[in-house]
Amino acid sequence: MGSALENYVNQVRTLSASGSYRELAEELPESLSLLARNWSILDNVLETLDMQQHSLGVLYVLLAKLHSASTANPEPVQLIQLMRDFVQRNNNEQLRYAVCAFYETCHLFTEFVVQKNLSILGIRIISRAIDQIRQLETQLTPIHADLCLLSLKAKNFSVVLPYLDADITDISTVAAECKTQQQQQSQHADANNDAKYFLLYFYYGGMIYTAVKNYERALYFFEVCITTPAMAMSHIMLEAYKKFLMVSLIVEGKIAYIPKNTQVIGRFMKPMANHYHDLVNVYANSSSEELRIIILKYSEAFTRDNNMGLAKQVATSLYKRNIQRLTKTFLTLSLSDVASRVQLASAVEAERYILNMIKSGEIYASINQKDGMVLFKDDPEKYNSPEMFLNVQNNITHVLDQVRQINKMEEEIILNPMYVKKALGSQDDDLTSQHPKTFSGDPTD
């Protein structure tokens, strides 16, 4: 081991032993280039450090290894095991002094396992990393997006769904606080990507909910992504907008309400999503055949955007919506008539749709197998059972909790010095913009 690396080890040991973690965290970024240049002997450095006692020192060695991964081509299993050991054994107290480096390490690790087609091996590791670094279960961190990406690549959603189901009440601002430091130490330029990882979390989250057919929640995630305040459009927001339009049709049969203050949508997104707006317009005609033609017409564009599967779900939703319309008009109808009226290929296909809709609670009906007649029924729920009462009570409690959280967040904003300064500044601007009246006569006139 060279003298420079020996100095690194001694520095880590000395400052860690004295509990000078802040000082160590401020000095270690300067050693990152040194560690990266000596990537071939970094395992020797790790042998002299303890993951629990010297977590900051091990973190930067791991970060250097991941920075060098593209050129060094390390053994994937060995590097994955090292990352797994680190997130399981590190000292969480020390990590608080180098959150940006920890985030960057997780981002690079995610890129590495995705490139090696080993995404499934990274899911539990990044999940553990999130649990370590977040301060609340409802806090969003930049590495939430990494967990979503790994889950999408691996097509495994069991781990990520509990994170997505938690409504966000706080966003990690540690990376933002590091930006001043980043101007001096450019090694952690990734910390400037707060907005990108915020958008990616809601974009990937919407895709995951779409994959598990939780379309209501998917619509909410895409809506957050496209309505995030922005002066210019990002590619992430554009792709989310395309999916937002299609999921809107599945959930509501039309474009879901979009706040008027999202000017970036009308100015930039709509002109770049013409195919999707054509799809919306045709859907409004309730003609399954016309919808099939428009999907076929734009199949190349939908496939290029990885939205062809979603387009097929839109077509399926129109068949279902047209069947639901029949329940409001007819009491009984033959399967062949159902197929004819909703433009399905056969009575067998109509029966399959109706049975699936009965099973999912989308309609209430029964099929007489002898004569092939469908009997449409009213909703059997009378809303007077103990279970329904308990459900209403739980919903009320949930809403009241949300109201309390919103009031708390509003109070924090109102008391924020930056907000107060900006609000007072706006009032001063309003006062100065009102030109004083020029008095040529009686000032009371």
UniProtKB/Swiss-Prot annotation:
<keyword id="KW-0539">Nucleus</keyword>
<dbReference type="InterPro" id="IPR036390">
    <property type="entry name" value="WH_DNA-bd_sf"/>
</dbReference>
<dbReference type="InterPro" id="IPR055089">
    <property type="entry name" value="COP9_N"/>
</dbReference>
<dbReference type="GO" id="GO:0036099">
    <property type="term" value="P:female germ-line stem cell population maintenance"/>
</dbReference>
<dbReference type="GO" id="GO:0050821">
    <property type="term" value="P:protein stabilization"/>
</dbReference>
<feature type="domain" description="PCI">
    <location>
        <begin position="217"/>
        <end position="381"/>
    </location>
</feature>
<protein>
    <recommendedName>
        <fullName>COP9 signalosome complex subunit 3</fullName>
    </recommendedName>
</protein>
<keyword id="KW-0896">Oogenesis</keyword>
<dbReference type="GO" id="GO:0006511">
    <property type="term" value="P:ubiquitin-dependent protein catabolic process"/>
</dbReference>
<dbReference type="GO" id="GO:0008180">
    <property type="term" value="C:COP9 signalosome"/>
</dbReference>
<dbReference type="Pfam" id="PF01399">
    <property type="entry name" value="PCI"/>
</dbReference>
<dbReference type="GO" id="GO:0048142">
    <property type="term" value="P:germarium-derived cystoblast division"/>
</dbReference>
<dbReference type="InterPro" id="IPR000717">
    <property type="entry name" value="PCI_dom"/>
</dbReference>
<dbReference type="GO" id="GO:0048140">
    <property type="term" value="P:male germ-line cyst encapsulation"/>
</dbReference>
<comment type="function">
    <text>Component of the COP9 signalosome complex (CSN), a complex involved in various cellular and developmental processes. The CSN complex is an essential regulator of the ubiquitin (Ubl) conjugation pathway by mediating the deneddylation of the cullin subunits of the SCF-type E3 ligase complexes, leading to decrease the Ubl ligase activity of SCF. The CSN complex plays an essential role in oogenesis and embryogenesis and is required for proper photoreceptor R cell differentiation and promote lamina glial cell migration or axon targeting.</text>
</comment>
<keyword id="KW-0217">Developmental protein</keyword>
<keyword id="KW-0221">Differentiation</keyword>
<dbReference type="InterPro" id="IPR050756">
    <property type="entry name" value="CSN3"/>
</dbReference>
<dbReference type="GO" id="GO:0007281">
    <property type="term" value="P:germ cell development"/>
</dbReference>
<comment type="subunit">
    <text>Component of the CSN complex, probably composed of CSN1b, alien/CSN2, CSN3, CSN4, CSN5, CSN6, CSN7 and CSN8.</text>
</comment>
<comment type="similarity">
    <text>Belongs to the CSN3 family.</text>
</comment>
<feature type="region of interest" description="Disordered">
    <location>
        <begin position="426"/>
        <end position="445"/>
    </location>
</feature>
<keyword id="KW-0963">Cytoplasm</keyword>
<keyword id="KW-0736">Signalosome</keyword>
<dbReference type="GO" id="GO:0000338">
    <property type="term" value="P:protein deneddylation"/>
</dbReference>
<dbReference type="GO" id="GO:0005737">
    <property type="term" value="C:cytoplasm"/>
</dbReference>
<dbReference type="Pfam" id="PF22788">
    <property type="entry name" value="COP9_hel_rpt"/>
</dbReference>
<feature type="compositionally biased region" description="Polar residues">
    <location>
        <begin position="433"/>
        <end position="445"/>
    </location>
</feature>
